[in-house]
Amino acid sequence: MRIGTGYDLHRLVKGRRLVLGGVALPFEKGLDGHSDADVLVHAVCDALLGAAGLGDIGDHFPDTDARFKGVSSLLLLTETGRMLKEKGFFVVNIDATVLAQAPKLGAHKAAMAANMATALGIDAACVNVKATTTEGLDAVGRGEAMAAMSVALIIEEEARDSRGQGAG
């Protein structure tokens, strides 16, 4: 059994689409970044890569690589899942939290979880998404940025339980 954590933060800017968990959200600003800047998916990728001892998102999908310019972060997550499977790991569960002052995300959390589960080929019940504000404090609270953090539990494929939960 292995556990990894992930964290990401991106600045909010005008003129960009806001994407969280692969869901395009109506909002006056979007996250600035090389890919679609989906902080939620980036944090999940980092948690999974860390749990597997495979470094971090920047090692595999650097912002200096033109192949990843504007790409959907769900594609990065799919590739992360492939790397884990190749190393013999099975995703048991993911728990992630988005930190954002606005917009309200409650109505979108299930779709975000479903998108990430689909990208990884796991049951949506194995992915949990939460959202919170920072009560007006820091860059997130001032509406200048959004952040996300995640924890992931993985096991070696041989240890996979008979219920068939997780990846694979």
Curated annotation (Swiss-Prot):
- What job does the chain carry out? Involved in the biosynthesis of isopentenyl diphosphate (IPP) and dimethylallyl diphosphate (DMAPP), two major building blocks of isoprenoid compounds. Catalyzes the conversion of 4-diphosphocytidyl-2-C-methyl-D-erythritol 2-phosphate (CDP-ME2P) to 2-C-methyl-D-erythritol 2,4-cyclodiphosphate (ME-CPP) with a corresponding release of cytidine 5-monophosphate (CMP).
Keyword Oxidoreductase part of the UniProt annotation: no
What residues does a divalent metal cation bind to? D8, H10, H42
Q: Which organism is it from?
A: Desulfosudis oleivorans (strain DSM 6200 / JCM 39069 / Hxd3) (Desulfococcus oleovorans)
Task: Give residue numbers for the site Transition state stabilizer.
Answer: H34, T133
Query: Annotated pathway, please?
Result: Isoprenoid biosynthesis; isopentenyl diphosphate biosynthesis via DXP pathway; isopentenyl diphosphate from 1-deoxy-D-xylulose 5-phosphate: step 4/6
Q: Which gene name does the record give?
A: ispF
What EC identifiers does the entry list? 4.6.1.12
Cofactor requirement: a divalent metal cation
GO molecular function terms here? 2-C-methyl-D-erythritol 2,4-cyclodiphosphate synthase activity; metal ion binding
- Could you identify this protein by its name? 2-C-methyl-D-erythritol 2,4-cyclodiphosphate synthase
Q: Sorted alphabetically, which Gene3D superfamilies does this protein's record hold?
A: 2-C-methyl-D-erythritol 2,4-cyclodiphosphate synthase
